Amino acid sequence: MYPEYQNIFTQVQVRGTPEMGMDDAGNNMMEERVGKPFFSTLAGLFGNGQIGPYYFGWTSIVAFGTGIAWFVIVGFNMLAQVGWSIPQFIRQLFWLALEPPSPEYGLSMPPLNDGGWYIIASFFLLVSVMTWLLRAYLLAEQHKMGKHIFWGFAAAVWLFLVLGLFRPILMGSWSEAVPYGIFPHLDWTTAFSIRYGNLYYNPFHCLSIVFLYGSVLLFCMHGGTILAVTRYGGDRELEQIYDRGTATERAALFWRWTMGFNATMEGIHRWAWWFAVLTPITGGIGILLTGTVVDNWFIWAQEHHFAPMYDGSYGYEDYGSYEAFIGKEN
């Protein structure tokens, strides 16, 4: 009887000697690994049950240190907004925010309580994110891997930099940056779209949504395909890439019969990687052009025959009466 996955959890957990990872004599990577490895049944339901050891390089220490500094600054500013009341902090957490400076300060350093804390927190967050990006590159170098994970994370960092650094500088004011808060940053997104004539008419926003939904579709198609042929060894994808077996043949046949085309066992990962990477890249381009090049995306879309031109009234007054507008005039 072939093993078969019947739910999203791993049903059989195999445990042996903890895997310590590779070590090159010249790198002394083992010296920087911390924590005694152990196994977690809960973690094993979702992936590999082994926890640790963790590789603590200098980039990890800097990233964690500055990230915690950002978290503490934002948290204490939110706590101060509710009079240092823990119950109110918990109650209003979703609505609290550390806001960027007001427009009158431009790109200067404002007083702490007028946006200065926001600038300081943003500095620590920038250092944390960029150091973590460097960590991804250095770890790939040490393991002699490709840089695909680094470039994938770099695409997300591009959007992060556009929102909090590049665009505010081009606009000449830190007030253009995104506030730190759960609902407030969503409110900022809505107001940003309304302010510039609806981002739906931004072609790069359109592309970003295409790649976002496309990534979800590809992930679902690939994940479903592999689970469907796991009983034939389809989960051993590396083997199937260089030595195609019955799992690959069955999966390829299924998709050829479904839509007339099938990706390869290697190619589907390139499709998924590019779709995922292009989501923040195109989104970042669209955000960077907003306000700097295009003031109103709806008018821009009309001028480029992307949106309809509305001439005159198009409310119920144009129909003579409200009843005629809703089609109930006698």
Swiss-Prot record:
Keyword Membrane: yes
InterPro entries (alphabetical): Photo_II_D1/D2_sf (IPR036854), Photo_RC_L/M (IPR000484), Photo_RC_L/M_CS (IPR055265), Photo_RC_M (IPR005781)
Record keywords, A-Z: Bacteriochlorophyll, Chlorophyll, Chromophore, Electron transport, Iron, Magnesium, Membrane, Metal-binding, Photosynthesis, Reaction center, Transmembrane, Transmembrane helix, Transport
GO biological process: photosynthetic electron transport in photosystem II
Alphabetized SUPFAM superfamilies for the sequence: Bacterial photosystem II reaction centre, L and M subunits (SSF81483)
Residues that, per the record, bind a ubiquinone: W255
Residues noted as binding (7R,8Z)-bacteriochlorophyll b in the record, renumbered to the chain: H185, H205
GO annotations of cellular component type: plasma membrane light-harvesting complex; plasma membrane-derived chromatophore membrane
PROSITE patterns for this protein: REACTION_CENTER
Source domain of life: Bacteria
Positions of disulphide bridges: none
Cellular localisation: Cellular chromatophore membrane
Coiled coil: none
Residues that span the membrane, as ranges: 57-83, 115-144, 147-172, 202-230, 264-290
Keyword presence, Isomerase: no
Binding site for Fe cation: H222, E237, H269
Membrane topology label: Multi-pass membrane protein
A GO molecular function held by the record: metal ion binding
SUBUNIT field: Reaction center is composed of four bacteriochlorophylls, two bacteriopheophytins, two ubiquinones, one iron, and two highly hydrophobic polypeptide chains (designated L and M).
Family: Belongs to the reaction center PufL/M/PsbA/D family.
Described purpose of this protein according to its UniProt entry: The reaction center is a membrane-bound complex that mediates the initial photochemical event in the electron transfer process of photosynthesis.
Protein name: Reaction center protein M chain
Gene that encodes the chain: pufM
